[in-house]
């Protein structure tokens, strides 16, 4: 997973308690995860807590985040799992901010 940068937007993928995946964007990942796990997040995750972050990809702006979210949600479950395994940032090279991604995947 990439490191967060102040004021950046993040595409995130959660694995819910029932094993399903949920994808969203946020500009505050920690707060958004707490909201999901408190049962006050998206309607989809409310009955599927707890959720854990399985992938993130930081974007340069909200527009890039929304476009990436839309593209990721169109993938099949298997394609999503493969992308998570390989690193979802590889799906969106046009949006990667080189200041945030130095090529290391620590």
Protein language model regions, located:
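GIY-YIG nuclease catalytic motif and its immediate N-terminal context
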Residues: 1-40, 46-49, 55-56, 64-73, ...
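Coupling/hinge elements of helicase-like and P-loop NTPase modules
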Residues: 78-82
């Amino acid at each position: 997973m990439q490191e967060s940068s102040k004021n950046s937007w993040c595409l995130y993928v959660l694995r819910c308690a029932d094993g399903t995946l949920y994808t969203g964007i946020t500009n505050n990942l920690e707060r958004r995860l707490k909201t999901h796990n408190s049962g006050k997040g998206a309607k989809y995750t409310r009955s599927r807590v707890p959720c854990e972050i399985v992938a993130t990809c930081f974007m340069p702006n909200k527009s890039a985040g929304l476009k990436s979210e839309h593209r990721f949600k169109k993938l099949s479950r298997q394609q999503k799992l493969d992308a998570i395994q390989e690193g979802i940032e590889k799906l969106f090279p046009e949006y990667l901010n080189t200041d945030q991604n130095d090529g290391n995947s620590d």
